[in-house]
């Protein structure tokens, strides 16, 4: 896998995070190259400009522009933030200010660079923040694959930010040029709230949380199969999203300590709010933005609930699910359980059988779209 980004007689060594022995995916894409090429060839920026970068996947843009400018990188991804930091260190770059999506968007920038997020609600939210924080003179340059930039995408820019135009395609990517000059911009609420049908659960979702305006079918199916057990002293919701599984687990197991983990800062904050509103602040809850279960002690949990993602940023991949399963096995107590839901076509049962042993994996429930699997950590497992 290529790890060296070479442009304008300069080379950066860039790697994805977490680092894998046989990495198949690159830490940057042609969109990163397109933005670098445009800024270097067309903008003629003087040194020491203040640049805001949104959604830098693994720090390619932050590493590049930090050489001559004052860079702030804002992201909703703990993994992207940690990957950016590692690449900055790897290339001995100048300091970059790293901030999360749940912090207030800073002001006073000369240029904004943006990787367009997959989630349209997140896009609208970020554009609204830019409209409120940036001057009309500040250029805002966004990038995505050409096939992902539709007329509706440009309408979102115009509705929430201001005047917008696009570039020609280059290496299957296009740039979007905009300014914060809309006179009557649309507005979007910071969060969406709703109640779960047939459950005593009220939910709030911040903009980048999966299934933002209703409960997704997989989570609804999983709610029906969360166990009740007085011995469950510590339950981990791995990839917690808005925390709906944690809320249900806490309702069913009032003595259990609940830990919500996600790599999305907005997901973690949604889960925090939802557990505290539905169950009160007196319960033992913990909320962590993390790369899976990094740093957790061995034999520290009795049950792990897991609804794995099958993408990282724009890339479709199953390595996150595998890492989640491996981490869960490591931190489970003897006879502890991993409860997993996934689409039937993802074949999670094969992965779990390899990891836990075929005799320790059971199908708990299934329907035409989803399957719920239980993997038990055997008494003799390491």
From Swiss-Prot:
One MF annotation (Gene Ontology) recorded for this entry: 23S rRNA (guanine(1835)-N(2))-methyltransferase activity
Domain of life: Bacteria
EC number: 2.1.1.174
Keywords carried by this UniProt record: Cytoplasm, Methyltransferase, rRNA processing, S-adenosyl-L-methionine, Transferase
Predominant subcellular localization, coarse grouping: cytoplasm
Gene Ontology CC annotation, any one: cytoplasm
Pfam families tied to this protein: MTS
Xref: InterPro entries: rRNA_m2G-MeTrfase_RlmG, RsmC/RlmG, SAM-dependent_MTases_sf, Small_mtfrase_dom
Annotated localization: Cytoplasm
Class of enzymatic activity (EC top level): transferase
Record's catalysed reaction(s): guanosine(1835) in 23S rRNA + S-adenosyl-L-methionine = N(2)-methylguanosine(1835) in 23S rRNA + S-adenosyl-L-homocysteine + H(+)
Function: Specifically methylates the guanine in position 1835 (m2G1835) of 23S rRNA.
Family: Belongs to the methyltransferase superfamily. RlmG family.
Descriptive protein name: Ribosomal RNA large subunit methyltransferase G
Native species: Aliivibrio salmonicida (strain LFI1238)
């Amino acid at each position: 896998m290529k790890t060296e980004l070479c442009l304008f007689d300069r080379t950066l060594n860039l790697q994805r995070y977490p680092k894998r022995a046989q990495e198949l995916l690159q830490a940057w894409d042609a969109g990163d190259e397109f933005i670098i090429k445009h800024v270097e060839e067309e903008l003629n920026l003087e040194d020491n400009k203040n640049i805001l970068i949104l959604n830098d996947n693994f720090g390619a843009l932050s590493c590049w522009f930090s050489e001559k400018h004052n860079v702030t990188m804002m992201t909703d991804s703990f993994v992207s933030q940690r990957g950016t930091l590692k690449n900055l260190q790897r290339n001995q770059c100048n300091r970059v200010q790293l901030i999360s999506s749940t912090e207030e968007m800073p002001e006073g920038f000369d240029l904004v660079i943006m990787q367009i997020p997959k989630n349209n609600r997140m896009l609208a939210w970020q554009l609204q923040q830019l409209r409120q924080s940036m001057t009309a003179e500040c250029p805002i340059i966004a990038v995505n694959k050409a096939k992902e930039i539709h007329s509706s995408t440009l309408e979102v820019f115009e509705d929430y930010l201001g005047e917008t135009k696009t570039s020609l395609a280059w290496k299957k990517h296009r740039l979007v040029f905009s300014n914060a000059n809309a006179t009557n911009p649309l507005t979007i609420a910071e969060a969406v709230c709703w109640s779960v049908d047939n459950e005593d659960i009220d939910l709030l979702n911040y903009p980048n949380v999966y299934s933002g305006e209703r409960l997704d079918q997989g989570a609804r199916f999983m709610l029906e199969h969360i166990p009740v057990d007085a011995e469950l002293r510590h339950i981990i919701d791995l990839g917690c999203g808005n925390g709906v599984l944690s809320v249900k687990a806490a309702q069913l197991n009032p003595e259990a300590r609940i830990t919500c983990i996600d790599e999305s800062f907005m997901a973690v904050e949604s889960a925090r709010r939802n557990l505290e509103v539905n169950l009160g602040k007196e319960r033992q809850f913990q909320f962590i933005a993390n790369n899976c279960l990094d740093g957790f002690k061995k034999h520290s949990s009795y049950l792990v609930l897991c609804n794995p993602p099958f993408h990282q940023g724009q890339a479709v991949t199953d390595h996150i699910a595998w890492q989640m399963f491996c981490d869960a096995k490591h931190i489970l107590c003897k006879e502890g359980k991993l409860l997993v839901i996934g689409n039937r076509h993802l074949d999670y049962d094969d992965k779990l059988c390899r990891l836990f042993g075929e005799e320790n994996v059971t199908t708990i429930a299934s329907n035409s779209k989803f399957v719920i699997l239980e993997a038990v950590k055997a008494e003799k497992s390491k």
